[in-house]
């Protein structure tokens, strides 16, 4: 099974889960907490692009959060 590639941006999933993708790194916000995850665990549809501020802070957040 081929794994889908995701373009940079924000994805909305079921149950209020939001995914943030930048340069193939993925953050998931679930119940108010951020986690690192992989493209195998994105269950959402592309909603809109990341803002410039989000892009600037992405790596800082990514490096601090736990793996899902």
Across the structure, where does each feature detected by a protein language model lie?
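Acidic, low-complexity, intrinsically disordered interaction modules
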Residues: 11-59
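Short acidic DE-rich linear segments
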Residues: 67-68
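Negatively charged, low-complexity tracts enriched in Asp/Glu with abundant Ser/Thr
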Residues: 2-7
């Amino acid at each position: 099974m081929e794994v889908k590639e995701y373009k940079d941006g924000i994805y909305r999933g079921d149950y209020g889960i939001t995914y943030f993708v930048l340069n193939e790194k993925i953050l998931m916000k679930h119940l108010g907490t951020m986690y690192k995850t992989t493209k195998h665990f994105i269950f959402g549809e592309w909603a809109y692009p990341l803002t410039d501020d989000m892009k600037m802070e992405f790596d800082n957040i990514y490096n601090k959060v736990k793996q899902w």
